[in-house]
Amino acid sequence: MGVARLRELLPDYAKDLRLNLGSVTSQSQLNNQQLWGTVLTSAIASRGATTLTELEAEALEHLSPEAAKAARTAAALMAMNNVYYRTLHLLEDKEYSRMRAGLRMNAIANPGVDKVDFELWSLAASAVNGCGMCLTAHEHELRGRGVSREVIQDAIRVASVVHAVAVTIESHEQVPATA
């Protein structure tokens, strides 16, 4: 189940991912809640059914119901915010950036867990979703709260590995490689 099962499902050509998945979930500067919340948020953001099923089951062994809800909330809000703010960043007409967003995001103010944890999870989802504007905002908030670059890097590493695992497993399940 979980990490072990995903490592078994990864094809031989993804041996590095197999090793990285083991490393990022066992050797981290993130505390247990930060780590498994980052794993869950990243799995949701990565949109891989098998990866989400496996990692969610394991994450729920490590997270309180409140933390699991907050991780899901971070993934949901970032799915919206990352599209919106990435689009504003990419549009040539910067007037859009000065307009009121008009999007509800009350959970960011009161996520039900430590604000640092929620910010780390939002950062991870933003990394998966590729929103530079959001990444900068979350990194700035975390650094302002005294979080080290090493901790931030660990959250980004978890997100990148979980995303790569999801992409690889889902594509391999759809079209098994011959080599």
Swiss-Prot record:
The gene is ahpD. Antioxidant protein with alkyl hydroperoxidase activity. Required for the reduction of the AhpC active site cysteine residues and for the regeneration of the AhpC enzyme activity. It comes from the Bacteria. This is Alkyl hydroperoxide reductase AhpD. One of its GO terms (biological process) is cell redox homeostasis. The keyword Transcription does not apply. InterPro entries: AhpD, AhpD-like, AhpD_core, CMD-like. The active site is at residues 131, 134. Disulfide bonds join 131-134. The keyword Disulfide bond applies. Keywords: Antioxidant, Disulfide bond, Oxidoreductase, Peroxidase, Redox-active center. It catalyses: N(6)-[(R)-dihydrolipoyl]-L-lysyl-[lipoyl-carrier protein] + a hydroperoxide = N(6)-[(R)-lipoyl]-L-lysyl-[lipoyl-carrier protein] + an alcohol + H2O. Homotrimer. Belongs to the AhpD family. One of its GO terms (molecular function) is peroxiredoxin activity. Its EC number is 1.11.1.28.
